[in-house]
Amino acid sequence: AEEGGAWAGLALSDEMSGNPAIGGLEGELEQLVPGDIMQASHFVAFMRRVVDFLKDRLKGTTVVEATDNATFMKAMVMKMQLAEPKALRFASQRLKSLLHTLEIVDVDSYEPISVIVDFCHLIAAYTQGFKVIIEPFDERLPNIPDPLLHLACLDASLAIKSVFEHFQSVVITSGTLSPIDLYPKILNFVPITKTFEMSLSRECICPMIVTRGSDQMPLNARFQNRSDRSIIINYGRLLVEMCAVVPDGMVVFFPSYRYMEEVVGAWASSKVLENVTEHKLLFIETQDVVETTLALENFKRACDVGRGAVFFSVARGKVAEGIDFDRHYGRAVIILGIPFQYTLSKILKARLEYMKEKYQIDEGDFLTFDAMRQASQCMGRVIRSKTDYGLMILADQRYSRADKRTKLPNWIRKHIKDSHLNMSTDLCVSQAKEFLSTVSHKEPWESQVGSILLSLDDIQGSEGVTRAPDVLLKPTPLPPPKERGKGGKDKEK
């Protein structure tokens, strides 16, 4: 029935679309499905050959550093004895059509084969911008075979290419687009940039760089020092003392899950966590989405009832990317170390090599740009409105260097005082007390007029409004309840 209907020499319909094309391949939806995979039985046999080929490639014991798509696809075509690679390109669409025809409801159970057909499509559709990397084992357990095949996208411009092609004007806006000069290179577009200052009526953020512990030992959580006991203990003292002075919620970001596990284990044995729980409840982000969601709900509940809580999270994790800790949920954020990517990663090495070759972007510049972008996102989690306030603590001496500090967004950088560039734990805690005692009082809205709220002159100048000041600057009082009748709504207006 399938071959006699929509597939009898007809192009794929929009309903069958859904290929994993990143951008610029929309025209393929109008092409014909290759005859060698048009019949369902032929397509199933074809996919078995694809799976056998991938299994054979994963049997090796040596790491395949990076293979471009064209080379890998050529090997697939030769090994599978295909006349042309067109069948690979349409495998994803063909599977979706087959599942649609069979009226499969539980599509999730076909996710493994969906991953394979998406892989085939991308391999055949893109000759540049991707690399295939095969790792036969986990570096932590080199004696146990655990093969993994990566299809790494090295060119970020492929993802946004279709957006630029379909729309004449594209506005990219964020509070953490800093430094902005690398984005046009990486995304391959010519920008017209405009930076707007953040209007604040008071010093509602207090960024501080803690470079020394309470024992004056330097804090530098670079990869070689991450197991240093003195650094871990000093981080623990900073956490305990901040929990004692900061009300409501706090968020602590670690560079990676592995480092968080190591530090939390050390803190548990040295009673740091026990001291923390005297002031606040403790919640930890995990790689399980359900567990993390429950932890966030309970964290907010603890803050709502006044118990206070601290949330341990990971930069580049779910919480750092999209969860807001506004108002009393985030009165302080502490970033332990700098969230650099794992520099020994094969995928990262391939990406750095690609960007250096195509865009002349130095490896060190990109790594610093990426790390500071992540740090900025973590810091911005606690400030979500102009009436919000919070502490931002960068606990690593490397943040005090100009090459790191200048890559922070200007709205954060301009609030870093010279006296906050090289602080010890004791000085940081003392400054935190002073800051919180100053900003914790609610600011009268009248003092915000002309700074973060429009004044009468602003409105009259832009719209030509000539109303009485008391109408613009004071809310109209509602009549007493006894004066409201059936026309109550009109009176309220």
Residue ranges and their predicted role:
Residues 1-493:
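ASCE RecA-like P-loop NTPase motor cores
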